[in-house]
Amino acid sequence: MAALASSLIRQKREVREPGGSRPVSAQRRVCPRGTKSLCQKQLLILLSKVRLCGGRPTRQDRGPEPQLKGIVTKLFCRQGFYLQANPDGSIQGTPEDTSSFTHFNLIPVGLRVVTIQSAKLGHYMAMNAEGLLYSSPHFTAECRFKECVFENYYVLYASALYRQRRSGRAWYLGLDKEGRVMKGNRVKKTKAAAHFVPKLLEVAMYREPSLHSVPETSPSSPPAH
């Protein structure tokens, strides 16, 4: 800043004294009251630009920074299907791997807990108190799934909110042999229906999703066509 101001003053002197041939007056010239010299105006403009460029942006200007490291992936079930979220809200398996509706964001929301969000639609996969899988436009407690690696290196996704009351057995995300979603309380972790292979597409950074209340009546997934 000081170097820029000095340069402006030097340029002003060179304009007043070309070639250095004119003698410098010992008397200081005083600007009339209420007026500013060209040099002073340039300095004021420079200072205003520095304040604008160097000022710290407010939180509203910056917005929340992405802090959660997750992945964009396809979830391939051992039954031979890719998990797919359809625009009508239904969830099913498909043998085709070219559809963008099979792309999901796996976002960490706790210790070994993730939320599964459709990368295409922005909706979250959720499991209600009856074990039915559905698509939610908002992130709720029903959208949280515990992620664990099974002994054969397949990945299991269990509801973080619900389980069998008496036995404590987890409710798992699963597809049957026809590619239809199963009720979580009927999926066993030892069966192929619950075994998934995440096929990585890219690593991404995410903002923490805002938690909404679970609706009083959680919708179930519409039947797949």
Swiss-Prot record:
GO cellular component term, pick one: nucleus
Chain segments carrying region Disordered: 1-28
Nucleus is among the record's keywords: yes
Transmembrane spans: none
Any GO molecular function: growth factor activity
Cellular compartments annotated: Nucleus
Keyword Nucleus: yes
Tissue expression as described in the entry: Brain and eye, and in a segmental pattern of the embryonic body wall. In adult olfactory bulb, hippocampus and most concentrated in Purkinje cell layer of the cerebellum.
Keywords linked to the UniProt accession: Growth factor, Nucleus
Matches recorded under SMART domains: FGF
UniProt-listed InterPro entries: Fibroblast_GF_fam, IL1/FGF
Family stated for the protein in its record: Belongs to the heparin-binding growth factors family.
Function of the protein: Probably involved in nervous system development and function.
Name of the protein described by the UniProt record: Fibroblast growth factor 11
Organism field: Mus musculus
Record gene name: Fgf11
